[in-house]
Amino acid sequence: KEYERYIPTIKGMTVDQDTRGTKAMAIGAATATRGGGCHLRSRFTMEEMDLPPEATKKIIGRPVPTDPDSYEGKAYPAIWMENLCAVGDALGICRFVTKWLSPGLLGFNDFAEAVSAVTGYEFTPEKLMEVGERIYNLERLFLIREGLDRKDDRVPERFHEPWQYGYQ
């Protein structure tokens, strides 16, 4: 697949963003169920905001290291965002009013409060995180049925090369 050198893809779909400097986003892009590193799922956009670890700990429950060249500590934010997006999608909530866009917007706490109020059953943020994980796992089962598996969870090889300036 010579073309992949010039047209980077994930799971057969073109990639919309180079994730060399955003490792949580790279993990999310590689493992997203939509392929292509779809910007509407698994994008821990807070990583681009260079928030200190104390701030991300308040938002997602764990500190996120700020080293743009390290994958250390970047898996959980990708999982957290994938689950948040899955729950938001299930509730019909536009991505642009959630923490996907900005840390001050809607998240699991808000979703739990709304779902509890509407259904009369108590939902906790932790329970909704579990719901998001189940949605994600079900989507992964569809991918497996269609012949995709862990070997397809990768960023394009080109994204492992150093940054270059100018036309590449």
Identify the meaning behind each predicted range.
Residues 1-168:
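Extended C-terminal regions of large enzymes
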